[in-house]
A protein has these predicted regions:
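Membrane-cytosol interface segments
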Residues: 1-96, 100-101, 106-111
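Extended amphipathic alpha-helical scaffolding segments in membrane-proximal extra-membrane regions
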Residues: 74-78, 85-171
Length: 171
């Protein structure tokens, strides 16, 4: 899925737009080959760079490419029905030299929704460094929320174990 956002300089509101223009944010969520080709052609980013970001095992890092900077972070998500509820997946952030910012993810993330809904204070698609820092802050907040939930789960299980007197309950 390809979505494009741009902050209006007059209204200072971020809106979904149809065309990729400078100072826009291109959000790719499990993109098709056609969407990757379209973004690569318009922005000048190597499509193999985007394709690499679709690997769920991609490691966090920062790389300087010919015409872009790549930042890969892991962001947490909750998978209720899995054995381990909390998992992470990579979010790729590409900041191009020709004023585009591209986010690439292998799953639909709620973490970026506040940017799309104009909830994040002082968010501007033209302010690439600020946007990056705001994404990192949102990611850190997501980890703190997940950590709090893990701690609550641990405390609840410790209470159950404390009340338990039979060995079968300990297994």
């Amino acid at each position: 899925m390809l979505k494009i956002y741009k902050t209006s300089t007059v209204e200072k509101k971020t809106k979904k737009v149809k065309k990729m223009t400078t100072d826009c944010w291109i959000d790719l969520i499990v993109p098709t080959t056609d969407e990757i080709d379209k973004v690569a052609t318009r922005t000048g980013v190597d499509k193999n760079l985007i394709l690499k970001l679709l690997d769920t095992d991609e490691l966090p890092r920062v790389e300087q490419e010919d015409n872009a900077t790549l930042i890969v972070i892991d962001i947490p998500y909750l998978e209720e029905k899995a054995e381990h509820k909390y998992k992470t997946y990579p979010l790729g952030i590409i900041i191009t030299n020709n004023n585009y910012i591209i986010t690439v993810s292998v799953k639909k993330t709620t973490m970026l929704n506040d940017f799309k809904r104009n909830i994040v204070k002082d968010f501007r698609t033209a302010k690439k460094t600020r946007f990056l820092i705001q994404i990192l802050l949102k990611s850190a907040s997501s980890y703190l929320k997940a950590l709090k939930e893990v701690n609550n789960d641990i405390e609840a299980k410790e209470k159950v174990l404390k009340k338990s007197t039979e060995n079968k309950d300990l297994v």
